[in-house]
Amino acid sequence: MTSEIQHYFTLFNDDFSYFDTEVHDWFLNPVVTPTAVKDIREAYQLTKDVTTYNAVLDRVYKATLDFMTVSFAGRHTGRRFLLALQDEMVGKTPLDYKNQVLISILHKLNFNVSDFVKHFPFARASLIRSQRNFHLEGTKTLPVTFIYLKDDAIKIDDFPQSQIFTYLDQKAVEL
């Protein structure tokens, strides 16, 4: 049915269990925006001050780079990272994301630390490209999904993945 699905999101703001179905071909593009960081800070009921904002930004940016780094081993590995991150962060805030959490996730994935170190420099360039593409699309809200069909494109702003998957499943049945 679909030729491509691009999903822009921010870590700690989404539920990633839906993406592990392998039914639809998703390209996950993390972005870090000031609004998303503010939303994360508010969702976790953290102090509303500049110091906390900067700390949340730092942790979200670090986790995003770590996800991008692991994703160089393949999209499936990247999705497994997101699911492991969700599991590790239950009952915690983004401020709790530290190297110990990363090491635990890499261990769960049987991901070689030397491969992580080797790919890390490329993650920053990949994140910059993802951010640029997000802004080129003229979008301002997260999450946002672009579904590129054979003859059409659909933009879905600020909907939970469960609703997007329901829509895609209905479209697949119609075809």
Residue ranges, per PLM feature:
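C-terminal cap of thioredoxin/glutaredoxin-like
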Residues: 3-23, 99-175
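Structural alpha/beta surface segment adjacent to cysteine/selenocysteine redox centers
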Residues: 15-93
